[in-house]
């Protein structure tokens, strides 16, 4: 006489937790398997999106503030007073959402003038 799946399920449902643990251990031994939860292969990891827009942040004017103000004016097109206020308000965003090449060029120009600059 053959036992059906429903009968097995009913038998397991009527067992205590300790009996179920013992049953699992016996099945692991008998069939040479592990009852550890198998991790299902999820969707492939999404490609990390490369950042395309960068912000250039003036963190400090440095010792040569006049040269930094000139560099800020040249880079941003601001007037003398606005550029001076921006440099004195450091840390301050100089340009936002620009390309990586443009950000690197601006950073290099400002650092040559004596400023401390970050690209975010």
Curated annotation (Swiss-Prot):
GO terms for molecular function: mRNA binding; structural constituent of ribosome. One of its GO terms (cellular component) is cytosolic large ribosomal subunit. GO terms for biological process: translation. It comes from the Bacteria. Transmembrane segments: none annotated. Keywords: Ribonucleoprotein, Ribosomal protein. It holds the Pfam family Ribosomal_L12_N. InterPro entries: Ribosomal_bL12, Ribosomal_bL12_C, Ribosomal_bL12_C/ClpS-like, Ribosomal_bL12_oligo, Ribosomal_bL12_oligo_N_sf. CDD domains: Ribosomal_L7_L12. Signal peptide: none annotated. Homodimer. Part of the ribosomal stalk of the 50S ribosomal subunit. Forms a multimeric L10(L12)X complex, where L10 forms an elongated spine to which 2 to 4 L12 dimers bind in a sequential fashion. Binds GTP-bound translation factors. Belongs to the bacterial ribosomal protein bL12 family. Forms part of the ribosomal stalk which helps the ribosome interact with GTP-bound translation factors. Is thus essential for accurate translation. This is Large ribosomal subunit protein bL12. It comes from Aeromonas salmonicida (strain A449).
